[in-house]
Amino acid sequence: MTGSVGSSMRSFALRILSAVLLSAMASTSFAQADIADAASKGNRAEIERLLKRGADVNAQQADGATALQWAAYRGDAGLAELLLKAGAKPGLANHDGATPLWLAAARGDAAVIRALLKGGADANEQLPLGRRPLMLAARSGNLDAVHALLDHGADVNASETERGTTALMQAADQGHAEVLMELIQHGANVAAASRPVMRDGRTAALGNSEDPRRAVRQQAIAVLCDAKTPDLREVRIQREMLFGASAKSTSDADLCKGIQRRGLGFVTVAGAGGNHGAGVGGEVTEDADGAAVADASGNPVPVGAGRGHRPPAREPDGGALTALVYAARSGSIDAARVLLEGGADVNQTTRYGWSPLLAATHNSNYQMARFLIEHGADVNLANKGGWTPLYLAVDNRNIEGGDYPVRTADMDSLTYITYLLDKGANVNWRITESTETRTVFTNQWLNEDGATAFLRAAQSGDLELLKLLVAHGADPKINTRLGVTPLAAAAGIGWVEGVTQERSPGETVETVKYLLSLGINPNFQADTGRVALHGAAHKGATEVVRVLVAAGARMDVRDFGNTDNRGSPTLAIHTWLPIDYADGLVRVGVQSAIPHPETSRVLRELMLKAGLKPPPEGRTLESLCIVDVCKPGYDPIGINN
């Protein structure tokens, strides 16, 4: 009995003690969380009450936020001073790495910044990605906040680690002229550049292959070898057509083995002489699985040869932006003026060759561009893509639905283009790379390499601009490097439905008439074999078709084949008439093959009138293959002729 009562009392006492401890723990935990909660609401009275009860002033919420961080975030300098006096740690960060000084600097809050610095915060503390408080304050534009940090020894030329930008670049990007002046007076380097980086590359395609006809033949070999049981005899036929008799001693089976292991990409368009990838006709090494692959003559490389070979590392070709480039990009003339007065070079370029003038033009900041020209900017300074202010201005005026948004210009585009021409812009300059507004859609069948501003204007049917360029000496007979004429571009070569900008269908017709009047040959074949009529037929521009045929355009001209028509090796190398494009049989790049019945009808009528036998209506790729082209040894390209 006694033992039972004693045991019961001990059990009761333990339950009471546990309840008291749990209550105390809950009370303490609540108080620790509550001080940051109170600060988040700006409840100073509650904070003072909690501090008197002994609450931990540095207690953190679930995300690491403290009361001092909330005071900085809310811009409450008085509360920040109270918390600092109570022992708040000014360098304590939340789980994202944000400190009270980081939050205050981002807001440009000079009063809170001073309170934190007085309380022991480090003006040069390292934030995530190497950012410094001065960079954030400079970006905010608050001059007093920048003063406060500089007065406490902030490094004016420190750079963050992600892109290598400095406080000067941050201020320039936001157009804060007064902050720029203050930073320069404290020794900011106006010539400093951000970190070099790699630019995004472009995928090679038939439109920019060095030899489109060989690219088509390579595609045929790839399709043959990709079959479950490759027809090695047909592979031999196609290889001899491509490489001649020199390929006779090679193993077709080994070649196909490499293609099967690597996929169709093993035989790439670039293998025909382009800059990307490798394959039949390109420099390659051993396959990852040990299969032999091909050398530059189409001969297999023995297993083990070239093991461990790696292409040389590419040097960064992007980045290295200066503060003046940032200012030009943002369009702040006041910021640019301060930087130039501080010694910035108006023609200093980025790693890819972007000058401040190019950056301003690319972003449609034409008032800024004019200001830079007035201060010595070279109007013909091109970047590594060969893009000049004139070409970019023409491109902006006729912008496509591209990969990059384009701002609304702050000056009439034709006024700016005229200004550039009057200042000596080279009207016949040829670019060397497709511009950034060129999408993967258009880049795959119209490469801008070698294009002039005139050709770019022609593509969009900008008749008014074409006449202006001619008046300033434009040569209408300069083609792209792969032989696309301004007439072909205007007619539809490179056209992508829903992407390519056109002034209007009517203006395009007038543009085609104008280009013909300048003496451009409508039957000039590009390296792909296409003529202007192929483009008009693919686009479904019926009236343009009529104009071209009336001007002597031939309807029996075949292209040199198309890597985008697959399904059989012979379809891959089949050559196509303009009527085939109108019938929706030819896919170009990622642009769908769209039938245009009205254009097809008109072309058939015109073919009959010219004594040509038009193909039957209602054709499909499947029916075409059955009755016409899918035969062993079929060679419409005549690559060795």
Predicted regions located by residue number:
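Ankyrin repeat boundary signal
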Residues: A59-Q60, P90-A93, N124-Q126, V156-E160, ...
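N-terminal segments that cap or nucleate solenoid repeat domains
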Residues: F30-W70, L79, A323, A327, ...
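Conserved ankyrin/ankyrin-like repeat signature
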Residues: E46, G78-L79, A111-V112, D144-A145, ...
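Start-of-repeat signature of ankyrin repeats
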Residues: G64, G97, G130, R163-G164, ...
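Ankyrin repeat A-helix N-terminal signature
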Residues: D37-K41, W70-D76, L103-D109, L136-N142, ...
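Ankyrin repeat domain, specifically the short helix-to-loop turn at the C-terminus of the second helix
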Residues: L51-D56, E81-K89, R114-D122, H147-D155, ...
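Bacterial N-terminal signal peptides
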Residues: R15-M25
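Terminal, low-structured helical/coil segments at or just beyond the last alpha-helical repeat
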Residues: G584-N641
